[in-house]
Amino acid sequence: MSDALRLDTCLDQIASQLPALTASCRVVEALAGAARQIAHLLARGPLSGDLGAVIGESLDGDGQKALDAITHALVREAVIASGAAAFASEEAAAPEWLDPVGEVAVAVDPLDGSSNIDTLAPVGTIFSILPARHASGADPASPFLQTGRRQLAAGFFIYGPRTALAVTFGNGTRIFTLDPVSGAFLAPAPPATVPAATREYAINGSNLRHWEEPIRDYIVELKQGRNGPRGIDFNTRWLASMVGDAFRILGRGGIYLYPADERQGYEAGRLRLVYEANPIAFLMEQAGASATDGRIPILDLQPAHIHQRCPLVFGSADEVRRVAQAYERAGQPSSPLFRRRSLFRSTSNVAELFA
């Protein structure tokens, strides 16, 4: 489409008008290159080898798939090439310093939804870009122990029927689609806006017996539909791939819930704050949606370590608010989590790219 916004054009304009974001733009451009390679591997399926083969054990004890290792290597190479200062990955036990004069730190989940590799369901790459905060002799984890409000940019690539990028630089959320002919990422539509109301929710309902009371009560109300207190019917959507559910919510609304529960290893939630919850929350808030752990806005949580877990609820603001109210009724107060999306960087025409 001749009138579609090209990602490279968008990044050039942001970098020229807001030099403080130049390093972040370089990272996104480099990650787009890695995403093209990952998309090509996935498109070939078994012709690329047994990408779903278990080749080892991940940090959390799950089986590490072949594609987990491949995507980690590709993304790491891209981040190094971008000139970033530090790199952290779900597939690495500890972060690492890269470039001593780099300006940003990049945290990634190289392959979200790896259980879907062999099923043609969507998988993705999630990233968060933070100020590097150099300090002599500092622990390479230090740049990543900032709240999500400090993110300079964030996004995810999703590999499904098509490859797409959802990205924000703090002034709205844009969705770019990879053109397989030209190799360019193009944005043919306006910035994403998540409707406040919805009738769709995403949660793994098989774990109902393990949930905290506020989540259980909220989901029971939805399941009662028009016969319950809500008076309307809801539909369940669950892809076992957070990027897939997030992409759908950015397009038409909905609420996603991955709460803490009573199972061993799930007491503090399952998703990682730094490189999963924070970037998704940033994207959602910049599209007019909300994200919380049930009590506190995700972007206000202070990480204590790089692989810290947290509960995560995000999506249409009206429904996220209801979850917070459920915690309040249960005597587990939540903090204010609904604020207008920030346009604090929109001092130039950059705002028009995302508005």
UniProtKB/Swiss-Prot annotation:
Mg(2+) 2 binds at residues 109, 112, 276. Substrate binds at residues 112-115, 204, 256-258. Pfam families: FBPase, FBPase_C. It is an enzyme of class 3 (hydrolase). Gene3D superfamilies: 3.40.190.80, Fructose-1,6-Bisphosphatase, subunit A, domain 1. Keywords: Carbohydrate metabolism, Cytoplasm, Hydrolase, Magnesium, Metal-binding. CDD domains: FBPase. One of its GO terms (cellular component) is cytosol. InterPro entries: FBPase_C_dom, FBPase_class-1, FBPase_N, FBPtase, Fructose_bisphosphatase_AS. Belongs to the FBPase class 1 family. PANTHER family: FRUCTOSE-1,6-BISPHOSPHATASE-RELATED, SEDOHEPTULOSE-1,7-BISPHOSPHATASE, CHLOROPLASTIC. This is Fructose-1,6-bisphosphatase class 1. The lineage of its organism: Bacteria, Pseudomonadati, Pseudomonadota, Alphaproteobacteria, Acetobacterales. The gene is fbp.
